[in-house]
């Protein structure tokens, strides 16, 4: 069966590829995707932010990114640390934005509903897969509501699965909120 791809309707953030080196290893896909998403939401607010790679380094520290014992020293961060680290950065900058997320096991229906709502609202989404096949965070350009909830990455069109049979999957986004 051919996937029914639903493409993001608006302009997407800066691509989250070509990770910079930070503290002796790659900055990590979690921090890099968060930096691209934050810059996308801060620009219309007129908020000056560091360049993508510098911001990714700040976010990697806030998200508690840790090096994996592999060549090139890739980094990883847990989904709850990704979310709390980005929200700490948003709070520290007094931005009227909050990061949100949903992740877990076999969440095909709830994640499809979130993607439908977020894409319809023109809100860019970061996908998350932690499975035997892939361990990655990345900005999404499309998704297909099917088994394992496949999604296309904005950076290069490759795929990830947001509801893998074995492992965790999820989505993250930023919303505008009213500050007191």
Name each model-derived stretch.
Residues 1-79, 131:
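Active-site-adjacent structural segments surrounding the nucleophilic cysteine of cysteine proteases
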